[in-house]
């Protein structure tokens, strides 16, 4: 478990569980992680998630999504902005992931959102990760 990069830890758990064809994955909770899970659900990369409150930190159970032949909905998920090297992008330099087939998740002043929404609202921010 990585205490220096909790978002990277969450993404790695999702990537590993997905490649091992697990149905669910449990990650420690935070507001940012919950919002990332919401974005992944809205974009159709995960089925659902459940937030477990325990009074301290809580946990998130993420239900992974697979096709009929058990191929994961998430082909790859990569951390872009890391604690040692933050990556911020302006509106005009938000990357297109696989020419629009994937999404980039950004943390902006208007909340956590995907690249299309950030371009539409004309906001830049920290490029958290890319998913396809």
From Swiss-Prot:
GO cellular component, as recorded: ribonucleoprotein complex; ribosome
Pfam families xref list: Ribosomal_S8
Keyword RNA-binding: yes
Any GO BP annotation: translation
InterPro entries recorded: Ribosomal_uS8, Ribosomal_uS8_CS, Ribosomal_uS8_sf
Family: Belongs to the universal ribosomal protein uS8 family.
Function comment: One of the primary rRNA binding proteins, it binds directly to 16S rRNA central domain where it helps coordinate assembly of the platform of the 30S subunit.
Name of the molecule in the record: Small ribosomal subunit protein uS8
Originating gene: rpsH
